[in-house]
Amino acid sequence: MTATRTIGIDPGTARMGWGVVEETDGVLRLVDCGVLTTSAELSQAERLLLLYNELRHLIEQYHPAAAAIEELFFGKNVNTALTVGQARGVVLLTLAQAGIPVYEYKPLQVKQALAGYGGADKRQMQEMVRLTLRLPAIPRPDDAADAVAVAICHTYAAPMIRRIEEGR
């Protein structure tokens, strides 16, 4: 009866969602989730440093065995894509320094894993997070629910990933 923890990350500079999901014998449980926030009054470098330090604290507190993060989606707003990319780089660096393997998933993969349908909207995804983890309410805020969703996606994919890695 081994418990495995996965931290899911929804990267962002102003708001970074995170969620820790634990799997024991096929049963998933939400350990904790939340959002790291930074003030717009800080410089970009100060915001990234704050995210780095806060993420390190979460890793020390929850001891995840793996991390899951959505692949970066390039929308029309180039500035948003750049700042999210910077936050994502901080996340990848922090996890690599801690020796935590990182698994990346496309938004479509996360939707298919949780809802069984790649066209699921945000509300449907949040409800599937609630149902999957048998929660009384949807995790809030939305950024935290998104992070929990990607952690669940990885938890579902992990057994197959292990088989593939063992076969190499």
Swiss-Prot record:
GO terms for cellular component: cytoplasm; Holliday junction resolvase complex. GO terms for biological process: DNA recombination; DNA repair. It is found in: Cytoplasm. Binds 2 Mg(2+) ion per subunit. Its EC number is 3.1.21.10. It is an enzyme of class 3 (hydrolase). The active site is at D10, E70, D143. Mg(2+) 1 binds at D10, D143. Keywords: Cytoplasm, DNA damage, DNA recombination, DNA repair, DNA-binding, Endonuclease, Hydrolase, Magnesium, Metal-binding, Nuclease. GO terms for molecular function: crossover junction DNA endonuclease activity; DNA binding; magnesium ion binding. It holds the Pfam family RuvC. PROSITE patterns: RUVC. It comes from the Bacteria. Homodimer which binds Holliday junction (HJ) DNA. The HJ becomes 2-fold symmetrical on binding to RuvC with unstacked arms; it has a different conformation from HJ DNA in complex with RuvA. In the full resolvosome a probable DNA-RuvA(4)-RuvB(12)-RuvC(2) complex forms which resolves the HJ. The RuvA-RuvB-RuvC complex processes Holliday junction (HJ) DNA during genetic recombination and DNA repair. Endonuclease that resolves HJ intermediates. Cleaves cruciform DNA by making single-stranded nicks across the HJ at symmetrical positions within the homologous arms, yielding a 5'-phosphate and a 3'-hydroxyl group; requires a central core of homology in the junction. The consensus cleavage sequence is 5'-(A/T)TT(C/G)-3'. Cleavage occurs on the 3'-side of the TT dinucleotide at the point of strand exchange. NCBIfam families: PRK00039.2-1, ruvC. This is Crossover junction endodeoxyribonuclease RuvC. It comes from Roseiflexus sp. (strain RS-1).
